[in-house]
Amino acid sequence: MNLPAVLNGLLVSVVAALLWKYVRLVEHTSQLEEELQLTRQSQEFSQVRIDYHGALLALQEHGTRMVCTGKMHTDRICRFDYLCYCTEAEEFVFFHSNASVMLPNLGSRRFQPALLDLSSVEDHNTQYFNFLELPAAALKFMPKPVFVPDVTLILNRFNPDNLMHIFHDDLLPVYYTMQQYSDLDDEARLVFMEGWGEGAHFDLYRLLSSKQPLLKDQLKTFGKLMCFTKSYVGLSKMTTWYQYGFVQPQGPKANILISGNEIRQFASFLMERLNITREEEEEDDDYIVVFKRTTNRLILNEAELLLALAQEFQMRTVTVSLEEQSFDNIIQIISRAAMLVSMHGAQMITSMFLPRGAAVVELFPYGVNPEQYTPYKTLASLPGMDLQYVAWRNTMEENTVTFPDRPWDQGGIVHLEKEEQERILASKEVPRHLCCRNPEWLFRIYQDTTVDLASFLDVLRDGLKKLNLKKAKVASTVHPGRVREPKCQTSVQATNEAKLSVSWQIPWNLKYLKVKEVKYEVWIQEQGENTYMPYILPHQNYTFSENIKPFTTYLVWVRCIFNKNLLGPFADVLICKT
């Protein structure tokens, strides 16, 4: 045996083994460095510490998990574990493993038209949310994920350049969606996926959480594959009261689910975050606020209007302007005002900060019918807002200044055919229309107006009760419970005459309440008939004889009513045989 050859062979084997171990060590070190770097990137989002290796293992083994509430895409909110987002493809990704959960499991119905709405604007085709699907094994071939350790709420802002949309479509829905889920607390992070920049009022969104909101474009700077360890996607629509006319002309929603109580709680939360307090004013220090616009839809005789208001109501008048004052300063002023006067516009959403008993006065340019544009009237009229509302419209064409030469989105019409321009100029009122580019609507709404003070003051005198903020109290909205122990007795007086006596006990909660007026509603229906006879009664028993027939079966329902309009539930039906 050649000893040198054997030794050389052994040496080569040892060196090869050492090199292999070195390469594995370098790879392992590189992997650790990469994971450390990705951990650092993940923690750039948050102070929350993350076990990167544990998170990656959870994603690889368990995949994505989704559980949703709501039956339709228009009312669905989904909770995800390890929902990912590919910043290059601009797509959300659901990774499947044997442990994945997808409820509801809709199959291809998920695309008809979408899993859910990302904004609170219902069924708008620019606001749909869906995801792509991949097996978890595909992670081996993809960039290493960067994990977002915060609980996140993922949504679209609808129009962050417009105050009405910011409050109605974004802030209120986000606030109450966060109230709905306990882990969407002050430490949660908002993620805006609509693709807009911050916008002029981004500070308002910052008030909802202690964490800086993330924009879609910012996600690209953190990595190619972002994975949200725990996220909620979508918004509650329960707080919205207005639809913008995408399918039918704009107006109040058919089924409004929010009251002034919830609006005022949200307004108080926002004021607290802005460090605004509602200080008690002196009895004689009520004042009127006039919203001043500086670029379009101007009040041309603003000084005269201020003087007329001061003389009519014997109050001082002040002006506020979004262009000239900070938002929190404006809210501080409005929150103690007796009246808010403004041309129609997004700034009127600030009326939600008015004290109870205050008045909202909305002015409309020539040709614009106030009954067709009512977001602020609807807000003021919500039960529990306790605001008075009056609308004034300019009916004098000589008191309007038009701008046909402006760009189309500022009301210009010179780009239209001459015949169409002439029709718009001759029109006395904008016909009902869909959103959002109706040229006649834009032409009229961007006019400047000289307010006819005589008609303006007449409208205020007719429409407003005496302004008295100090006595404005929260109206009770407590509903009665079911009446207790309902009973019926019958008797036959003759072959064609019978009596039906009904009695009951008061609702259980009534003994704990102070109610001005308590009445009872009784419905009587002959079995087999489609119609019934309703009765409103002041007492807890009554004997009916009119239209009561012998040897007949009657169905009887009873309920309690507080203060004429607070209806309780019906008690179980009584079956009464004469």
Swiss-Prot record:
Identify the residue ranges that face the Lumenal compartment according to the record. 26-578
Q: Which GO terms describe its molecular function?
A: acetylglucosaminyltransferase activity; protein O-acetylglucosaminyltransferase activity
Tell me its EC number(s), please.
Answer: 2.4.1.312
Q: Which UniProt keywords apply?
A: Endoplasmic reticulum, Glycoprotein, Glycosyltransferase, Membrane, Signal-anchor, Transferase, Transmembrane, Transmembrane helix
Q: What biological-process GO terms show up in the record?
A: brain development; muscle cell development; neuron migration; protein O-linked glycosylation; protein O-linked mannosylation; retina development in camera-type eye
* Keyword check for Transmembrane: yes
Residues covered by the Fibronectin type-III domain = 482-578
One GO CC annotation: endoplasmic reticulum membrane
- Which reactions are catalysed by this chain? 3-O-(alpha-D-mannosyl)-L-threonyl-[protein] + UDP-N-acetyl-alpha-D-glucosamine = 3-O-(N-acetyl-beta-D-glucosaminyl-(1->4)-alpha-D-mannosyl)-L-threonyl-[protein] + UDP + H(+)
Q: What is its main location?
A: endoplasmic reticulum
Named in its record, the pathway it takes part in is:
Protein modification; protein glycosylation
Transmembrane segments in this chain: where? Answer: 5-25
UniProt-annotated glycosylation sites, renumbered to this chain: 98, 275, 541
Q: What membrane topology is given?
A: Single-pass type II membrane protein
**For side Cytoplasmic, which residue ranges?**
1-4
- Compartments (UniProt record): Endoplasmic reticulum membrane
- Which Gene3D superfamilies does the record associate with it? Immunoglobulins
Q: What does this protein do?
A: O-linked mannose beta-1,4-N-acetylglucosaminyltransferase that transfers UDP-N-acetyl-D-glucosamine to the 4-position of the mannose to generate N-acetyl-D-glucosamine-beta-1,4-O-D-mannosylprotein. Involved in the biosynthesis of the phosphorylated O-mannosyl trisaccharide (N-acetylgalactosamine-beta-3-N-acetylglucosamine-beta-4-(phosphate-6-)mannose), a carbohydrate structure present in alpha-dystroglycan (DAG1), which is required for binding laminin G-like domain-containing extracellular proteins with high affinity.
Which family is it part of?
Belongs to the glycosyltransferase 61 family.
Q: What is this protein called?
A: Protein O-linked-mannose beta-1,4-N-acetylglucosaminyltransferase 2
What organism is the protein native to? Danio rerio (Zebrafish)
- What's the encoding gene here? pomgnt2
